[in-house]
Amino acid sequence: MAQSLSRLWTHLIFSTKNRFPFLSDKTIRMDMHRYLATILREQDCETLIVNGVEDHVHALFALSRTNAIASVVKEIKRTSSSWVKERSPKLAKFYWQGGYGAFSVSHSNLEDVIRYIENHEEHHKRMTFQDEYRAFLKAMVLPMMSVTFGIRWNADSLKA
């Protein structure tokens, strides 16, 4: 095959440092989501949706065939952090957390994930970010998370 083809749908989740609610202003939060989508497109990642709440963000996009997920995440965090600090003196201490979660999504599940991200604010009236992330870990069965986050996972540590 003379060409390279790739279509890796990715559900990316990351939070503000220490889950501080930096994005509590709805206007800034919505602007941040639009800006993150722009950065993803600039990284050649077809972006379907970006949404979130005061302390974390979800994005659903097709990972570019020429970029690694770590490079894409590093760029969107770096660029958006600088952008938001320039927007408001109140956000001078804004930072993203060091880690992230990136999960592959089957094409057949795209609509469900889009709906989940669209209704994210409503979802968090029933579930905390920590509980949500535990559910992702449990569903995805990711024992390698101990390497990424330095936490020893077992069945008890994934209980809500």
Residue ranges with predicted function:
Residues 1-159:
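Basic nucleic-acid-binding interfaces
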